[in-house]
Amino acid sequence: MDTTTSIKMTTLAIQNLFSYVEEENLAAVKVHLDKFKEVDGRSDNGQTPLMLASEQGSLEIVQELIRRGANVNLDDVDCWSALISAAKEGHVEVVKELLENSAYIEHRDMGGWTALTWASYKGRVEVATVLLENGANPNTTGQQYSVYPIIWAAGRGHAEIVKLLLEHGAKVNCSDKYGTTPLIWAARKGHYDCVMHLLENGADVDQEGANSMTALIVAVKGGYTEVVKELLKRNPNVNMTDKDGNTALMIAAKEGYTEIVQDLLDAGTYVNIPDRSGDTVLIGAVRGGHVEIVRALLHKYADIDIRGQENKTALYWAVEKGNATMVRDILQCNPDTETTTKDSETPLIKATKMRSIEVVELLLDKGAKVSAVDKRGDTPLHIAIRGRSRRLAELLLRNPKDGRLLYRPNKAGETPYNIDCSHQKSILTQIFGARHLSPTESDGDMLGYDLYSSALADILSEPTMQPPICVGLYAQWGSGKSFLLKKLEDEMKTFAGQQVEPLFQFSWLVVLLSLLLCGSVALVLGFTVDPKLAIAISLSILALLYVFFVVVYFGSRREGESWNWAWVISTRLARHIGYLELLLKLMFVNPPELPEQTTRALPVRFLFTDYNRLSSVGGETSMAEMIATLSDACEREFGFLATRLFRVFKTEDTQGKKKWKKTCCIPSFVIFLFILGCLIMGMALLAVFKVDGQNQTVNAVLVSMASVVGLALLLNCRTWWQVTDSVLNSQRKRLHSAANKMHKLKSEGFMKVLKNEVELMAKMAKTIDGFTQNQTRLVVIIDGLDSCEQDKVLQMLDTVRVLFSKGPFISIFASDPHIIIKAINQNLNSVLRDSNINGHDYMRNIVHLPVFLNSRGLSSAKKMCAPAPANGETGNSEGWHEELDRKLSQNSLGDQTKFGSKTTLNRRDTYRRRQMQRSVTRQMSFDLTKLLVTEDWFSDISPQTMRRLLNIVSVTGRLLRANQISFNWDRLASWINLTEQWPYRTSWLILYLEETDGIPDQTNLKTIYERISKNIPTTKDVEPLLEIDGDVRSFEVFLSSRTPVLAARDIRTFLPCTVNLDPKLREIIADVRAAREQVNMAGVTYPTLPLQEGRPISMYSQQSSACSPTASFNGPYNPPGVSPQPHSAYFSGMAGPQHPFYNRGSASVVSGTPSILLSSMSTDVICERVKLIDGIDQNLISQYTATIKKANINGRVLSQCNIDELKKEMNMNFGDWQLFRTSVLEMRHVENQVLHEEAPSEQGSITVGHVEPCRHAGAAAQGVAGNTDTSPMYNFNLSFEELSNVGLEEPPRHVNATWMGTTHRTPSMSSLNSQESSNEICKLTDKQQAEYRNAYEDYIASMSQLELGMEKPVPPFVSQLMHSSSEDKKKDGNDQDGRKSVSKRGSTKSGSDNTDYASADAATLDPITEEDEKVDHGSSKSLLGRKTSGDKVSLFQGADLKLKAGGGSRYQKLTSDDEESEESDNAPLLKDGKKPEAKASDGGDRSLTKGKDYLSDKKDSSDSGVRSNESSPNHSLQDEEADLSQSERANLIELDEENSARKRGLPNSLSGLQDPTIARMSICSEDQCSLLASSPEESWPSSKSYNLNRTPSNTTLNNNTNAQQGNHIRQPSDSSNTTSTTTGSDVIINPGTSTTSATTQNENVRVVHLKRGLNPGDPPEILKVSSETVTFGEERESIL
């Protein structure tokens, strides 16, 4: 058909027809066709209206067009027919219409596609069905790729069409041009239904398609699990590979299809088939990171050592991927860990490069070799250390054998060790420790010495610092001071070595020298050759020289590598010319005076003695060697000639201040030039005229010149000789020759030689400095003084002082100050000793800047960096220091002075920094001086002290800055002065702060000092260290001085950087307390500051009173309320119970162990305790107490109840609840501690026969701790309630619970009793006595108020008041007196035990401060134990012991010497709680026990105390235990008046005693007992445990001890334990009085105490003590 013609004939009408067809406007089409007959008109692309209508699916139009005769088989330019268009678009009806009208069903378009192909491609199921039914060919193919309809249908997922085609005969295994079958196409996209139809129709599963892919491979690649499963059911060849050699398993493994991999493995796939690159399935899985697949493959025994591409194994790939889990799995199969890649890397090397610590560890565990090397020769160690990985290096070196690899070089010659050394921060030292810690190690500032050395170097190189200065580097022997010396030396050199190299300059000297050179050349040539030639050559040389000088001059000032040679020549020329100039100046010029350093700071240089060459320190020869090394250093620095010629040409003082040295009023250099001129002229004349007899004139001139020169030489023969001598003989030679002549010179002559040499050296340094405008400082380092012979130390110090006290010397002592001071003390002559000058004063006088090395302090300082407030005084704008502070920080002086400023500073920076420091230092010293001198405490300051203080302030300031701690200079100055003048007392303050938590920063030191002052020894006999402190009154004035008042914050800020305070002082103080702890078993805590809660016993909670400043130390410090005691016996080994006066304002929770355990308190005690809680709302007290009584909240309830339930029950307001809760928790804590520590107590505790077992529980624990050895019996097992109820008619007193804590009993009362101790006691001042007296009066008054129902306010402690001093005890009479007085106190005679206890307690009277005296509502001043106003502590309620007002303090009796000795020996812990079996049968024993008991008493102060405290009921003869319980319950000791009358010598009214009969022993009482009471020992704090029951008897401890010990076990009438003659005692508790009965009828026990110390004639003393008061503690002495 002629298509072209038809197209050209297209008309507008045809276009209209097309538009109507497009719009599907049938009517318009009809109208148009009616009008125009042309049906088959064509569009531009050859389409007919029928094709368009078929494509659009407009059936009616199609029908209309066919009816009008349209040709159904026409095609367009693309050979598309109407049928193809309709089939493609899926218009079934149109297809049917066309087929009915004979459309050609197999018509192909230009691509060879039939209508069926299009229907299959497009998924037109209905169309395909119609076509197939009408006979379409299902196996037709396209022209280009020969793709069958079924392939299109399968590949595109048209499952129904696939099924249709298969049903109509389509080939199931047909393939396209590349051999890809329908099954492969269907599997490729995972069309499951298509695959199923194909498989059901017998599709071949192993046919390969494009790229050799089978259906299985493409299905696996697509991850179509279901398809794969179906394919595998057809048993395909699972090992077929694609074109890259990948099997289905390889592909699945790489892609991570775990389930498919498992299916394939189950189907028997080979696991070790490699791909084309050689990688196996396992490697593929590993590279993909698929752990489960790897495990599956390993389970199927995949080969793990096959090498893939680049020789990498699966293990290597796992390492490279960093997958530790996979590595672990592979390693379990024992792979070869040493296979290498093409780069010779093993898995271990790769793991190390990747820094995979876990993988490295796994490989090493599997035995991988650390010695493997890569192609560069690097081992894993090289790599780890180069990568700075400490952990890796540590792992690699864990086998010591591999340490050798540190020194194995790689191909470049690097060893791991050298690589490490080349880095600033070594990692090998972190692994092995500082194997090569050396002073020069810049990276190893492990000792914190960098800051010290930098700060010191900064000060010593400060231009304004005026030598001589002596620095003391103090540290314990062996602490590495020598390291610091080397560091210090290096630092000083870097601080000083910052001068710029001088460059060549033209000067008169250069001109003169060049002329001389040329002249001499001319002379030589003139003599030898022709004079004219000589002149020409010399002038040429001169010209060349100056050209050379000019080039060097300008070239050295040019930048750039090419001019380096000029700079080198310029500096060398300058150096040599400068040296020549120096030599000439030495000969002809007087040295100029150095300018004032404040106007112009000259650079500083240091010369050091080589202290390492000293074989031994001490002795003249070593000093000579030291000076010799210094002279060697001078020669190295100043030059060989200058130093030796100085001896000849040194300036004499007679020269005056003129510039030139003169000879006969003519400057020497003029004479020299004249002679030199004569010489040169003569030579010139000789050269020109020769020696010619004809030339008279010349000859005359020559003769005259020769005579001038000759005369000059003759006159200076002596000088020439001196020059020759000094040049040949160095200073070192002279010193050695002097040392060799020691036997002739003697010591004095030798010292004179040394002195001359040192002065010459100093003068030389000063002279050369004048010429060179430098400051030279000669540093003499003396190391090892602490290891030389003691007798040489003083001599060495004197020598240093004599030799180096003038001139530019800096002496540095590195030594252990304690050893040195000890050596000085041994060797000081008697005159100095008599004038109270000791080694410490001597060293202080010599050393201007002490530095105690304390690296711990510095490290802690780092925690207080910049954020730290400026010591709370930032707002204090008054004064220069604020301004200076601000300036310093703003100028970042802190940064610039960071002491590391080494040579990296360029010249300008250095200069600026120096200027800044200089101005700061100047301002600081000026203002500090003004500040310090205006202060009162500085009135007696000497210039030397001032200098020392300023030096220390300067160093400390630098260290603070280095740690970025902000501070104020005036506070720092005050602190330094405090530590300088009173180091010992300051150490006490610091120790207190270190050991006590929660002290607010604002607390001023005065407050703290008041708390601990009484703990500090007052006499040097007791504490030799007191010698190092200044006047104590000045110290107190200083602490309260107006500006600035130092506070706790200041200590915390300054302490880490304080260099002048010996840290060992605190150790000594602590050690002393610890020692005393062992001796005394009981301690006293420091008083807590009112502002904080007391803490439970601190570390030192039990100190032996023997050593501690207070007689007994239950803790590091007194209880919050305890006013510290005088310390006279601080080191004397005496111990005494602590005096119990309490300060009122103590924290609600009292630190220290309570005397009474919480669980043993009754409701009344609880009520009393609540009242005593600091800060509780007093208006609501009545409501709270009512609640407590109503709910029956007693101690046992509080110790076990739920706190939340308690809160609901108490219904307190928030604040009160917090205070109450804290108090309860504290008491619980203390009880737990006590019970824990004293678990053994129950066994040892005295079990009172009839006391219910429950009693024992609570108290026992306490009791036990106190007496260890002998006091098994002291443990009281009575519960508090039982004790309190025994025979009490009134509510128990809870006042001083503290005394109860037998646990804290200080065992060494005995020592108090020693003669020595009593002597010491006598040393107490009257003032203290007066304080005691007043305090005691107040105490009695308060007790009387407290004593609610008591007829007689007899505080058991009163009895204690009467402790007889050891002297008294020694005197039998005294003892008896003491006893009597005690008995007086109560009509009952207390078993001597009681008395003992009492006396012991009495011994502990503390001085009472005024604040102590203000006792709250009767919380008596007595601070029992540590608890503040004992009430806080469990108060032993039941007893009389209700001390008045807070349980008046008890006075304990001092033990006698024997007792003391025994006690000290026994110093048992109550814990031992040995059973009373130890009843002492004989007095000796008794006393021993006594001592021990006493010790335990220290807790309780006496047995009775012990007993009373805990299970104190005396075992009365009848039912001792019952009685005891009763007696204890009735802690109240009522003394019979008759007894009191009996007591001898007790004044009826002891000061403040209300009832003469009761007459508590007052400190002021005249009686010997009272004397005891008032004796200094009173000042000893009584131990916490006091026997409440104890009667005041003064009987000696021995009696008490024996009696009580006996009592513990003793049979009622048995006095077997007691050797003391005990008459039947009257201690009887009426049967009617049950332990629980409120009233106890105390029958007086009549006891005869036999005092061990009694003189043979003394009659035994009989004391009556209420049974209540009798305690078991010393029941060993039986109470009959």
UniProtKB/Swiss-Prot annotation:
Topological domain ranges for the Extracellular compartment: 530-533, 690-696
Motif (PDZ-binding): 1675-1680
Comp. bias regions, Basic and acidic residues: 1365-1380, 1471-1502
PROSITE patterns cross-referenced by the UniProt entry: ANK_REP_REGION, ANK_REPEAT
Keyword Endoplasmic reticulum: no
A GO BP annotation: nervous system development
A Pfam family: Ank_2
Composition bias, Polar residues: 1388-1397, 1505-1516, 1603-1612, 1631-1643
Annotated compartments: Membrane; Late endosome membrane; Cytoplasm
Cytoplasmic face of the membrane: 1-508, 555-668, 718-1680
Domain KAP NTPase: 449-960
A GO term, aspect molecular function: protein kinase regulator activity
GO cellular component: late endosome; late endosome membrane
ANK repeats: 45-74, 78-107, 111-140, 145-174, 178-207, 211-240, 244-273, 277-306, 310-339, 343-372, 376-405
Keywords: ANK repeat, Cytoplasm, Endosome, Membrane, Neurogenesis, Repeat, Transmembrane, Transmembrane helix
Listed transmembrane segments: 509-529, 534-554, 669-689, 697-717
Regions of compositional bias (Low complexity) in chain numbering: 1574-1602, 1613-1625
Stretch forming the signal peptide: none
Its membrane topology: Multi-pass membrane protein
Chain spans, region Disordered: 1362-1554, 1574-1643
PANTHER family, per the entry: KINASE D-INTERACTING SUBSTRATE OF 220 KDA (PTHR24116), KINASE D-INTERACTING SUBSTRATE OF 220 KDA B (PTHR24116:SF2)
Self-association state and partner proteins as the record states: Interacts (via PDZ-binding motif) with pdzrn3b (via PDZ domain 1).
Role noted for this protein: Downstream target for both neurotrophin and ephrin receptors. May play a role in nerve growth factor (NGF)-induced recruitment of rapgef2 to late endosomes and neurite outgrowth.
Protein name, UniProt field: Kinase D-interacting substrate of 220 kDa B
Gene designation per UniProt: kidins220b
